[in-house]
Amino acid sequence: MEQKFYICKHCGNIIAKVKDTGVPVICCGEPMSEIVPGTADAAVEKHVPVWTVENGIVHVKVGSVEHPMLPEHYIEWVSLQTKQGNQRKELHPGEKPEVCFALCEGDEVEAVYAYCNLHSLWKA
């Protein structure tokens, strides 16, 4: 199942759906909206994750041009989707927009997501 993320338009809560049973996800009394990757009007080269795998470690850099990591504009988290599941790492202003994930033997990367506090979700 492709990883899907949802946001509450009222409070800003974001969730990752683990299993889709067809029932809408509700927050603040209303259905949450699915976040569709890459739909914000922003620089692709600073938002799309760039990843490599070396010796079972997935190295992710956000953007082919490094994304800013300022308090007012930064990557909040990076999520890795694999054949066997998913992992997520949080980032904070002042840090480099880079993370690493370990893969178990036989697992493979399916997608990498990055969430920008201003420009929403991006996928590679």
Where in the sequence are the language-model features?
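Short cysteine-rich clusters marking metal-coordination/redox-active sites
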Residues: 8-11, 27, 116
